[in-house]
Amino acid sequence: MKIRSSSFIAAWLLTAHAVICTAGQLIPGGRSFDLASLQQAAVDTDPRLQQLQLLTTQTELRLRNIAAGRLPSVTVDGQAQYQSDVPRPAFTLPGGGLLFTTPKATYDSGLRIDQRIFDASINAQGALERAQLAEQQARVRTTLFSLRQQVNEAFFTAATLQARQGALSATITDLSARLDETNERVGAGTALPAEAASIEATLLQRRQDEEELRATRRTALARLAILTGQTISENDALAMPDLAAAVSRARQTSGELRARPEYDLFARTRERLAKQQDATAAQERPRVSTFARVGYGRPGLNFVSDQFESYGLGGVRVQWNAWTWGSSSREREALAIQQRIVAADQAAFAKGLGESIEGDSATLDRLQAMLALDDRIVALREQIEQSTQARFQEGVVTASEFLDRSSELLQARFARATHQVELAQAGARLLTTLGLEVR
């Protein structure tokens, strides 16, 4: 990343901070809100924040279910059955009797206990659940981080209007003083009533502008209040953040920073896919378990008996899905492709982020240059306005010409105030783009 005039921009950010904080003090009887606390309030009051704890609780329940797979499973069953034919002995006893008689109606009930000894899929499934939790929580944090940029926009919209109110208030105060002087001159016969009327009309127009600014600012503050869950009135001031040092450091290290939550989300997604591959492979491994059954029925284990008997049995079972026709390997290959897709998404995100950083840096440079001219323009407009004011008091120029110069000075102050806020906004936007907190 190319570094451009960081020291100059730092100086101008300090100037913007000082000037706009002064404008904020023009609003009496209110509280002061800073950008960092409002950003945090937006995150803290967003309903989606509770998803982090809900996801944790959900995963804990699922992990308990997975861990229960290691515990013995107990099954109780029973059945009654009638069959049309049964085994018969191939020969008879002397006298024509049968060696044994097998009943056609059978009854059986019992209790079965199964205990897993080895099952690789249990650990793999638990690891997959934890990886899914990390991915889901990273996605929630990414969503919540987007609130910071929304707060930035609402905050600086209101701050721009606040700064303009300060400039307009100074103009109204000056016009009120000029109107009083002109009325005195009219009373003394050294000025025409039309000149006083012209100044008064302009003063009323400026007061209209002030009321319009207040209404627009109330709307901006209302949006900011909704975003942050705070109660913000029009008497409250917005304190501009001092971002000079942070912006300077960020511009020097922007190429190496990976603070955006999206980077963590990409990493968690890759980890989840890797755990999913492990879980797929674990399904192919043999499973070993023991079993035992006790029961009562007719017949018992002696199938040639026609008496009700109790019985018991136990053993070891091995299960192995030895041949899956390549389905498991294809699934793992599909997951590997998904990892490559995630890598491509991350590369595209990094590219877009780089473009945004370049744009923010260019905006900082542009506003720094404009502010250097703004200061000179305002200084010249003040000189011209003061000179015209003195000549107007002497009756050399008309009220119309004086008001034209006053309007030009107001527009110059408006432009400077707007550029000062825009410079601070560009600094905050750069920090947010890089994933850094505004402090």
Label each region the model flagged.
Residues A23-Q79, D85, T106, R116, ...:
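Bacterial Sec-pathway N-terminal export signals of envelope proteins
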Residues Q50, S73-T92, P103, D114-L144, ...:
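Small/polar (Gly/Ser/Thr/Ala-rich) solvent-exposed segments
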Residues F33, L144-A259, T363, L367, ...:
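Periplasmic alpha-helical coiled-coil/stalk elements that build and connect Gram-negative outer-membrane
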Residues S37, T106-D108, E153, S198, ...:
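Transmembrane beta-barrel architecture of outer-membrane proteins
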Residues L111-I113, V316:
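Membrane-embedded beta-strands of outer-membrane beta-barrel proteins
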Residues K2-R4, L26-P28, S84, A415-R439:
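Acidic, low-complexity, intrinsically disordered peripheral segments
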Residues Q51-I66, T143, L147-A167, A177, ...:
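Amphipathic alpha-helical coiled-coil segments
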Residues A10-I20:
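Bacterial N-terminal signal peptides
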